[in-house]
Amino acid sequence: MKYQKLNRFSDSEFKRLVGVPRPVFSEMVEVLKEAESLKKKSGRPHTLAIEDQLLLTLNYLRNYSTQLELAANYHIAESNVNRTIKKVEDVLMKSRRFTLPKRSITTADEQFNWVIIDATECSIERPKKNQSKFYSGKKKKHTLKAQVIYHPKSKQIIGVDISSGSQHDIKLARKTVKKFKHCDYVMTDLGYYGLEQDGFKLLMPIKKKKNFPLFDAEKNYNKMIGKIRVVIEHINSQLKRFRILSERYRNRRKRFGLRINLIAALVNRMNLQ
């Protein structure tokens, strides 16, 4: 669908179709137009308008259609679809307006600066080499693991880190510890229990021991932690509304990190609207 045909839809329908609200879409178009005007050699003009190039890219990330399908829908060559998607993604990331915050986020209440971390897995095609490196025993398939660091007070994702599916969540957390070392508390699930040894104050459920049932106070504490921590599950759900992250990833793995960071930045923008 071309951009001109979207004018008849309401704002809520536009977001459902495209994946982002109209104001965010307009800002992305502005970034692409600025980049186009700064080109020293314009070269051959693109068959599609800037708005349609962005729409094609968002359609790819949101619905994860094959590039052949997109080529047929937009009446361009399949290779042109691939170049367009890559160009739009690169321009948005280089603009720094659609990236995750680089500086440590602080709030007025410095006595309780905290983050929530969680890892989610995205299935990939079976690699030709090093299959065991990407095999997830939990999911029983080959995956890439994405660790999401969320700052509840600012309502922003402040970091997304990628590793192979076989790596344990806590190992990935220890590799990226610099991103949340300024925080007093880290809220996690029981898979991150060992982070306590690294000097972090963990907010996590109390584990039930064999033959020792939890007291009512401990059960209430676990419920309270669960109610607060569920926000990270909602964030993971928002990320996976873009089917490129929820379906089996068919592309080369080297651009997976760029794409999930771009999608995380879009989720941040939508949550701050």
Predicted regions and their residues:
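Charged, often Cys/His-bearing segments associated with DNA-binding zinc-finger transcription factors
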Residues: 1-42
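Glycine-rich, flexible loop/turn motifs
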Residues: 2-5, 10-13, 44, 131, ...
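Short secondary-structure boundary/capping segments within folded domains
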Residues: 17-19, 45-48, 59
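Short, small-residue-rich loop/turn micro-motifs
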Residues: 32, 60, 206-208
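A short glycine/serine-rich beta->alpha loop
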Residues: 40-46, 249
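Short, amphipathic alpha-helical "recognition" segments used to contact nucleic acids or chromatin
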Residues: 49-63
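Short, well-ordered secondary-structure "scaffold" segments embedded in the functional core
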Residues: 50, 64, 69-273
